[in-house]
Amino acid sequence: MGASLPPKEANLFKLIVKSYETKQYKKGLKAADAILKKFPDHGETLSMKGLTLNCMDRKTEAYELVRLGVKNDIKSHVCWHVLGLLYRSDREYREAIKCYRNALRIDPDNLEILRDLSLLQAQMRDLSGFVETRQQLLTLKPNHRMNWIGFAVSQHLNANASKAVEILEAYEGTLEDDYPPENELIEHTEMILYKVSLLEESGSFDKALEELHKKEPKIVDKLSYKEQEVSLLSKVGRLEEANKLYRVLLSMNPDNYRYHEGLQKCLGLYSESGQYSSDQIEKLNALYQSLSEQYTRSSAVKRIPLDFLQDENFKEAVAKYIKPLLTKGVPSLFSDLSSLYDHPRKPDILEQLVVEMKHSIGTTGSFPGSDVKEPPSTLLWTLFFLAQHYDRRGQYDVALCKIDEAIAHTPTVIDLYSVKSRIMKHAGDLTAAAALADEARGMDLADRYINSECVKRMLQADQVPLAEKTAVLFTKEGDQLNNLHDMQCMWYDLASGDSYFRQGDLGRALKKFLAVEKHYADISEDQFDFHSYCLRKMTLRSYVDMLKFQDRLHSFPYFHKAAIRAIRCYLKLHDSPKSTAGEDEMSKLAPAQKKKIKKQKKAEARAKKEAESKSEESTASGASKSGKRNVKPVDPDPHGQKLIQVEEPMAEASKYLRLLQKHSPNSLETHLLSFEVNMRKQKFLLAFQAVKQLLKLGAENPDSHRSLVKFFLMTESISAPTTEAEKLRWRVLEAERPSISQLQNKSLMEANKEFLGRHEDSLVHRAAYAEMLYILDPSKKTEAIKIIEDSTNKVVQTNEALGQAREWKLKDCIAVHTLLDTVLLDSQAASRWKSRCAEYFPCSTHFEGKHCSLMPDSVYNSSRKSNENGDTPNHPMGQTELSDGQLEAFKSLSVAT
């Protein structure tokens, strides 16, 4: 570096490099300017000056200088390396790799460039290139441990675990007999356990077990040793030994559910589906009775039997489990037992049991069959549990009654107001839910979780400004909304995006949904620093697990939800474009002219973007000269207006659709959106492929049925094909149609009728039938409406201890109301449906039920009026919280407790 310079300037060049490494950017710039004064065309100095400016957020100048440096000294590996570093800093990894490869053509044995290249190859999952680079590093420096380990890991990632084992064995052959020293015991342990895991992954279980036992004296992590050993013993079929070892592990941690699962598998008693034979139940019961005698304080040992016990045995066990927790006052008890509600009989048993407990405590002060007096709080937590139970079963009136009783008993418990808020949300009164959540928040202004719950309720009630003010109470001073974004608060972005979408503000909605995508990009970027760190620290198993996690990152729920919502925004933009005079003129032009104008617009947009970028940098350059990174620039599009001005919404939607198809292929929504997008793009074969996937994943799903009917109705309505491509497409569709069982020897009308016959008792299926009937034959609109109105809201079979639960869900009823109003276009039918549903959901603001907060004479508003008139307040905080913690917007809202 700097070899072509005289000694004085060469020393200055070394100073530039040192200043860059120590982040003394002003000092580095001064040295670079001193060299360039005498040698203005020195490529390496220009490149280093550009690299320094890049660290000071003067990116445009940086790229200009570095590219000039490469131009002036194209045969310098330093210039190419620096250009690669610039691209890497901007996440342009493919361009950076090209630059590194150019640098290596000039200096093929440069260790620093090879290391940087290997990091990028690992990041981009260029696994064959990663193997090649790590092998080259090992060849150049075989006495460096990290090069051996890096080569082994590269082979492992490239699906060659056996080769990775060979490399680790070769490395072990270079070590002394007394290795490792005291200060490297942990690193060596990690390497041994990693090697054993590789043998396990390659299927060499016996060899892995032998290696583990052989190296036991050198392994200091005894817990990992035991966990690895028991896993291998199970896989080689030595179940008796595995059984004993799992019991040893349980003695160390009896609340580890993985150990319980492993023990059950060893005994042949584990069930993936949760269904057990009577013999399995008997053996499991005996096992956990013996374990409960050993581990009297273990909650897992008490909780696990509730999953497999039935009837009276279940009732006895669950009573024994919940009594001490109700006495203690554990708010999370219902969450703990919520999985039991997936079993057919257990919720009824729970209800009967807890109702008996509540009655007994209320009358005698003790649990049934006990003489021990319970503290007053036991009744409170019993009511608290019952409220959540009835909420889960859809009996919102009973749930509200129970939670009000609990509040009357002890009006100072915050959890009661949070649960009442949740019940009101489920019952359909989102405004009241937000007010209650704010009331709970006001009782403890330092509780971040309660604050977040309140924000969520406000967003669900479309009170976005209030939600923002509340959310930023727990962010840093300064630019609080940006701080909220930096915290990667994805639930907030999704909830606020949903609110904007409901309000028709597609710009802001898209802004929020794409912010979630940005969070995922940042998470993916965060792995970069670990490629070298984990090899250096020898945390190899965690490193490989992290890479596997990153590979499936986009399959996680938040990204899935954000991508689906973003696609729906683009669909709405496509269906309702904002036409302008310019667009009207465009529609009159010939295709060639349109193409030319579009090309010009793209070039203008690109030039404008570059100009804006330069303007931002020049504005920020004053602060940059200090040598420190700038504060974040102001968002040029805070309301997302540029996002909704996209020329081709379907092209943008397709980007996110491809990610969903790759990472969420088993989601019905993925293929439903694929159908919607491809129908709009007139890519009929892809749309048909989506229909087939929908039928494969859920043939009886109403949306699958809708898509099937819409697709073949469209194919029947299109004129005869003229081009060869169109003819081929129709031949494919004609050949494939008989493979659809729903349409074999049937017309679409007949298939629709059969669909209704299979689901006569389901509201959502009747609605799907009615919609398709109207689309197939608009003259049958009256019949379609009658099919919906003849639906019956049946009572769900329960023990009917308190009230009755009905089948219809609020969201389904709202969807049917929207269908009647906007698709079938019958306002009178929609009004009749609204009145009918108001009876079933009296708290729903959508249906304006008699108990919802919109009604002036509702129970809620009457209650608030009585408080204001001086009657006994039914809320502990009265007017105090209105001035101390509760938001002003809720002062006028009446919510009874």
Swiss-Prot record:
Reported induction: Down-regulated upon abscisic acid treatment.
Superkingdom of the organism of origin: Eukaryota
Keyword Repeat: yes
Sequence ranges of the TPR repeats: 77-110, 111-144, 189-222, 223-256, 298-331, 380-413, 488-523
Compositional bias segments (type: Polar residues): 863-872
InterPro entries: NatA_aux_su, TPR-like_helical_dom_sf, TPR_rpt
A single Gene Ontology CC term: cytoplasm
Database matches in SMART domains: TPR
One Pfam match: TPR_1
Keyword match Repeat: yes
Comp. bias (Basic and acidic residues): 602-617
Segments of this protein annotated with the region Disordered: 578-640, 863-897
Reported consequences of knocking out the gene: Embryo lethal when homozygous.
Tissue: Expressed in leaves, roots, shoots and flowers.
Keywords from the UniProt entry: Repeat, TPR repeat
PANTHER family: N(ALPHA)-ACETYLTRANSFERASE 15_16, ISOFORM A, N-TERMINAL ACETYLTRANSFERASE-RELATED
Function: Auxiliary subunit of the NatA N-alpha-acetyltransferase complex. Required for male gametocyte development, embryogenesis, suspensor development and the formation of the quiescent center (QC) in the root meristem. Involved in plant immunity through the regulation of SNC1 stability. Required for embryo development.
Subunit structure, as described in the record: Part of the NatA complex. Associates with ribosomes. Interacts with NAA10.
UniProt name for this protein: N-terminal acetyltransferase A complex auxiliary subunit NAA15
Species this chain originates from: Arabidopsis thaliana
